[in-house]
């Protein structure tokens, strides 16, 4: 059986007995007060807070297997992290040599209890350490059990206080892992400390466990509020989605809007001008036309629909009475009313056109007075008639006024021949056409 004298770290560490942190299988209990727990160091090291302990599940399992489930004294290796601890190395060596022959001594360095009081967990029970409850309470328990390393001035059998009853220790077992302060070969980083901050303040593991749960209880309302906020955002998004019209709604509204606009007697330009004057959004006639033809983008259609709907409601509610919409529409109507000419008046104009396609201003005035028409109406009619003649005459076929005159079937025999001005005008138009074709 290996003894404490064979410890390779004997020169800079003290010897700990085979007592180890033992899990109790009894229901509702934590660490048993009577069982072997972390023991204090011998004389020279008692009360020295610089000594730190390295625990290894692998070493515990190996030593337990080789000694029938009991741990030897060098299962725990004590490493000093400050240089002044090496001053008591001689005293530690002497104490270790004195106890080399009795590994189960009852001295302060030896076992705190009999080996029968220690229970070592089997490998099957260790698998239970990975359950959900153990993982949830891992940081608090780990910190609580590691904090007992600061109790250097205690008695020979310092034990871990039990946590509140009602929680099964089989599922909330201790989970030992390598802290962040470890380096190669289990040596400790001097700046790091494994002492729990709660015990440094004089608090107990129970208080730390309660504080851990209180911290979680404080975090849960925050998460609940966070979920409520997301729920509110989702409800707002769904509400905005309901307000957004679909393509079918836009198509149906555009069709109804066009029918109502025509029935009310407003042009597309009137609607665009009314929107700009009433609501501050100026739209052209082309935009209104493209809306009715569903040629705008979906985004622009959605923006324009509420304005047109508002205008349509106001126009429907004020039908039959002079409103601001009618006044605005009247201002927007820059085109004059279409003039309809009777058949008899149109024949007189046609006969005069055959004699002179481009009459002078005096001839237009005289003709307007005879036919009881406005001067502007007569002038526009002659302009339109000349454009029609150009479309009807095939290119490359020169015609004289006499040819036009003879081909006119509705011209009477007493119609005077065209004047020289008309002939000169007609010849000039033919010359221009010939030059253009060349």
From Swiss-Prot:
Tissue spec: Predominantly expressed in the embryonic and adult central nervous system. In adults, isoform 2 is expressed in the brain, ovary, basal cells of the skin and muscle satellite cells.
Pfam families, A to Z: Homeodomain (PF00046), Pou (PF00157)
Record localization: Nucleus
GO biological process terms held by the UniProt record: brain development; regulation of transcription by RNA polymerase II
Domain annotation POU-specific: ranges: 242-316
Keyword check for Lyase: no
Endpoints of the signal sequence: none
GO MF entry, a single one: DNA-binding transcription factor activity, RNA polymerase II-specific
Binding region for DNA: 334-393
CDD domains registered for this protein in UniProt: homeodomain (cd00086)
Chief location category: nucleus
Biased amino acid composition, Basic residues: 210-230
Protein name: POU domain, class 3, transcription factor 3-A
